[in-house]
Amino acid sequence: MDQNSSDIVQTKDVVLAGELAMLVSPTNKNFIIRILPGGELHTHRGIVRHDDILGQFWGSKVFTHKGVFYYILQPGLGELLRETARNTQIMYPKDIGFVLVMMGIGAGTVVLEAGTGSGALTTALAWAVGSNGHVFSYENRPEMQKLAVKNLSKLGLADRVTFKLRDIQEGFDESGVDAVFLDVQNAYDFLTQVRQTLKSGGFFGSIMPTTNQVQRLLISLHQNHFAFTDVCEVILRYYKPVPERLRPTDRMVAHTGYLIFSRKMLPNTSPELSGDQFDAQEKQDNLEVPELDS
C-alpha cells in the first residue's frame, strides 16, 4: 500500500475535528456530540474533554475526569434519528428504512416530502441522497420548520435540503423529481399536485394512521393514474442478545402506521381493474410460475 492510501485508511479510523461522535457508557447511555478542539462534555459521570477524543481510534475508550469511561463510536442513522428533538410524533426508524428501500432513494436521488414535522424523515432522506442528491421539504407550520432546520443543521445535513413554508394545496415548485412522500393526513387530496411534480414512473409514498384514510388514498391513486400500489405495515421485534436465554425483549414496536407505495403512470396506461378483477388477476399471476434455467 502506498503512503497516500495508508493516510486515507488512518484518517478514516480516527476521530477528526468537526466529526460527530457517539459516546456510549457501559450501561448504554448515549451522547452524540460534534468534536471541537477545546470542547467539553459535562455528564453526571464527569467531564469529557474533546481533546482527549481527537485522534483516538473509533471503538476505543475515553475517560472523564472522574475516571469513568465511555466508548467512542460513529453514530449510525438510527442513533441520529433517536436524537431528533421533537414537538410531534415522528416516524419510527423501522418505517423510515423501509421507505428508503421501497422508493429507491439513494445517492443522487431528488426527492420531495410534504409534512416536514420535526425532520426525522428529512434527516434520513438527506443522509441517503448524499451530496449529489437533494431534498425539497414542505411544511405549513413555521415552528415545526424552524425545529427541523435546527435538527438538520446540528447534524450537518441542512445544505442537502431546501425547506419551504407553504400549504401544499398551492402546489409544488419542482418538476421531474424522482420520488414524493406525503406525511399528511389527507394525502388523497393532493395527488394532482404530486403528478405535476413527479417524473413519469416515479415513486410515490405516504404514511397514514387509519384504514379509512388508506381506502380514500387508494381510490384517489387509481383516479390519478397511479399503479403497482402496495399497502403494508412494518412489525419489528427485538431479541435479548443473551446466548443462554435468547428470547424476545419485553417491549415490541408493532403497528405505527400504514405505508402506501405506488408508481406514477402515463394516462391510459394504468391498469383498470375492479377489486374482484384484481383478486382474480392476482390468483392467475400466482399460478404462472416462471421456469428456471437448467
Each PLM stretch: what is its role?
Residues 1-74:
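N-terminal auxiliary segments of SAM/dcSAM-dependent transferases
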Residues 10-13, 83-97:
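Conserved SAM-binding loop and adjacent beta-strand
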Residues 106-117:
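Conserved class I S-adenosyl-L-methionine
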Residues 118-131:
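Conserved SAM-binding loop of SAM-dependent methyltransferases across substrates and taxa
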Residues 129-130, 157, 198-202:
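Helix-to-beta-strand junctions that scaffold the AdoMet/dcAdoMet cofactor pocket
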Residues 132-136:
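Short beta-strand element of Class I
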